[in-house]
Amino acid sequence: MAGSSRRAGGRRLQLPLLCLLLQGATAILFAVFVRYNHETDAALWHWGNHSNPDNEFYFRYPSFQDVHTMIFVGFGFLMAFLQRYGFSSVGFTFLLAAFALQWSTLVQGFLHTFHGGHIHIGVESMINADFCAGAVLISFGAILGKTGPAQLLLMALLEVVLFGLNEFVLLSLLGVKDAGGSMTIHTFGAYFGLVLSRVLYRPQLEKSKHRQSSVYHSDLFAMIGTIFLWIFWPSFNSAPTPLGDGQHRTALNTYYSLTASTLSTFALSALVGRDGRLDMVHVQNAALAGGVVVGTSAEMMLTPFGALAAGFLAGTVSTLGFKFFTPILESKFKIQDTCGVHNLHGMPGVLGALLGVLVAGLATHDSYGEGLESVFPLIAEGQRSSTSQALHQLFGLFVTLIFASVGGGLGGLLLRLPFLDSPPDSQCYEDQIYWEVPEEHADLAQGSLRPEEPDTQA
């Protein structure tokens, strides 16, 4: 009972104090450093005698709306498949993303838009912050149900910094192309989360295994998340690309890649399923792999056929990963990947990076014409050959894996600090620990909750 009281006291204090501390610090930094850019500042915009329809808002905000919906609705409901963790899946997604948006605005601002002593923000800053939040939520998926909200906020605090540094190295220093984030978002977020999960490994998690499954209605909620993500993914990949043919091509390639990954998912799920039955886990996740795999190459001249082939391959690999590789990750590598982020984001992200290497290596002036300057400016300017660009793309993948692995290890050590509240092994994947729940849920939960025991992270 004493241990239970101490845990309850920690929950009562840790989250409020950390939220207030982080929000207060962020607000001070915003007051000191953050300013509107020339397209959002009233004086600067009108001083330039610009026409309002020329403002970037009108071109970027529709894409931002789609990306924003993906982050808060798509990711949140996709992770709501656990039978007793729906409040936490959607609610902690809301909390993490809200903090990550503010913190990443500062981190990315210092790295990309800092001049004259200030960070200058506009609609593009909002899109980039959403991308960073997406990486954080991917990592959250790997440890879903096994951590407390205070731990998750500290994870986001560290991960946003490392995401920003990795993105800066790849895009600004190495000149890597990765508009849809196969490397910077999906690969980074997945392997950060997987290494984090390994450091937080719980040998006695079997005590909560009965809750690590879905019920009929929770799978339907997760499918809502899938549909939102699937519909808006072309906007996600095309949001940061140059306006015009580049953005058009990116949306088109993503669109067809998603259709192919969906068909391959249904085909493989029935093929490997018991009695030829479809598995909702496969459909919820692997059907989205087509959006991940073309994240790097969608703005390139991938060709419609290439988009279909990439999507079909990604859906196949992802489905087989859920069926065969996820159990091996836990039994052999001690990685407890709750949402299967390795199958949806990790492997398709790496495949997407390698596809980018291939397509970049094939880039020529004949195939791109004057458009080469917007897609591969260093090749167009004669500073690089296509082969050199391809090698830089490959090196960018290795850099991302290093950042993710080291960052995940550091994050795991941070989250293992003994004073941080986390659910005991017997109470993982349970909303009632952190939320007021309806009485019928509480009655069901009480029957399965066991007395609190010490954590067994090894």
Swiss-Prot record:
Gene: RHBG
Membrane topology, Cytoplasmic segments: 1-13, 83-86, 146-149, 202-219, 273-282, 326-346, 415-458
Any one of the GO BP annotations: transepithelial ammonium transport
Catalytic reaction list: NH4(+)(in) = NH4(+)(out); methylamine(out) = methylamine(in); CO2(out) = CO2(in)
Motif (Basolateral sorting signal): 429-432
Family named by the database record: Belongs to the ammonium transporter (TC 2.A.49) family. Rh subfamily.
Known role: Ammonium transporter involved in the maintenance of acid-base homeostasis. Transports ammonium and its related derivative methylammonium across the basolateral plasma membrane of epithelial cells likely contributing to renal transepithelial ammonia transport and ammonia metabolism. May transport either NH4(+) or NH3 ammonia species predominantly mediating an electrogenic NH4(+) transport. May act as a CO2 channel providing for renal acid secretion.
Subunit structure: Interacts (via C-terminus) with ANK2 and ANK3; required for targeting to the basolateral membrane.
Protein name from the UniProt record: Ammonium transporter Rh type B
